[in-house]
């Protein structure tokens, strides 16, 4: 392809903003003795924890340097055994996610939002392994290359009902990847 892959490291403070009223965020580092040490980019990840048992975990990722092109969007999740809360680690329940993407329209002046994974189509994340989830593809009508402020955002949130006990609300995220779509 004529354009390159974009990789957004989840643990970097400038790459994301969690919803403060529902979500607590932690940047975590893997121990060198962890079997996943060489499989996780930068040996670190973002842990998002709900503020309460009824909170829906939610975060926005800033995405810079998109070109006017089509990308496949992927999110790399880590296994639940890495969760700081040992009850979450022990239960090892899957995440169910919803994903939206917002970006500038063709005129470059207004933000459009697209549901990559809508609520009714929530995607299950495997809690037992590193799971690279392909959440869909998107075509950006304008380039944001070299813009100082990220106008492209990926919104990731828990897709479950309040108080649901069979789905994990704790997200362990390595990175977000936008790969050039293969034609």
What are these regions (language model features)?
Residues 1-183:
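Extracytoplasmic
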């Amino acid at each position: 392809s004529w354009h390159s892959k974009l990789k957004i490291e989840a643990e970097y403070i400038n790459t994301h903003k969690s919803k403060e009223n529902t979500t607590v965020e932690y940047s975590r580092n893997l121990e060198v003795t962890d079997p996943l040490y060489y499989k996780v980019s930068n040996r670190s990840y973002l842990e998002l924890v709900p503020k309460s048992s009824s909170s829906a975990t939610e975060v926005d990722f800033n995405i810079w340097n998109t070109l006017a092109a089509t990308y496949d969007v992927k999110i790399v999740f880590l296994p639940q055994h890495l969760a700081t809360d040992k009850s979450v680690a022990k239960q090892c329940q899957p995440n169910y996610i919803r994903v939206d993407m917002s970006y500038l329209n063709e005129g470059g002046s207004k933000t459009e939002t697209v549901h990559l994974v809508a609520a009714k189509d929530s995607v299950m994340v495997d809690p037992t392994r590193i799971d690279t989830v392909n959440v869909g593809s998107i075509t950006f009508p304008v380039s944001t290359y070299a813009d100082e402020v990220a106008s492209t955002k990926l919104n990731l949130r828990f897709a479950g009902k309040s108080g649901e006990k069979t789905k994990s609300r704790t997200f362990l995220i390595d990175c977000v990847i936008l790969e050039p779509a293969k034609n």
